[in-house]
Amino acid sequence: INEINLYSTEMAAALCALDNAKISANMSNRLSEAIVDSYKKTNGAPITFEQILTNYQSKLQNPEKDDSISSILKQLVRNKLFENEDKANLINECFIVKMDAFPKDGPIAKAIVYFLISKLNLIYEQLEKQAVSDDYVQIRHFTIIDEAHYMLDFDNRPLRNLIAVGRNKGLSIILATQNMASFQSKHFDFYANAQYPLIMKQQTITDSVIKDLFGVSGRELQEIRTEIAGLQKGELIIKDQMAFALDLGKKYKKIKVSHLI
């Protein structure tokens, strides 16, 4: 029961995070209660958005009148995003999730990423640590999110948790965006947790980001700005970990690649 109560609070926070609409404390509490009621009716078995919506509406004075929560739930139900049972092997198979049918900054696209990443969290928490030798570490899985800025501007807890969990489980997470400032999220310090920041040519170069990544200012800052602005196709700027640690020489390297994976 305690686990369900905790999960109901987390799920309520998740649904609230998917939309920018203002959600009152009463709505959030009502949603948590609806989730708990749904689990009671399934005796702890997995629940669906339809069940949550039905139980949520039963707590409204006028079930026909939508509020912010019921509106989100109806969108999730209407779009039939997920199966009622697991049929995909997210570890041993490769999937491309196409989301171009949905507005990238809307609740449906966010829900797809949010709950898929949540599922990966559950899987990776159960795995043994990655194999490590003197020369190599095991990479089990790549999770790549293109146009990631749409997924960084809200409280995306599963993504934060996956970054933390994946570090010693052989998970590589690649967050790709055209604007380096997108990683300066108020919800999470993505730069502090980025082991290998890769910078391609940028239309907008943010000084505060360069300072955070490379620990530079003044002439060194301007030098890196110039290098980024002059990057050609396939060229990247990366942090020189050795120079950064020793505080010697240039804090960056310029490399040329044909592909990243």
Description of each model-found segment:
Residues 72-79, 175-179, 214-218:
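A short linear-motif detector with a strong N-terminal bias
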Residues 168-171, 176-183, 201:
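Conserved H-loop
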Residues 20-30, 183-261:
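P-loop NTPase motor core of the ASCE superfamily
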Residues 1-171, 184-187, 227-244:
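P-loop NTPase motor domains
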Residues 95-97, 174, 196-198:
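Hydrophobic/aromatic beta-strand patches that form the interior of the parallel beta-sheet core
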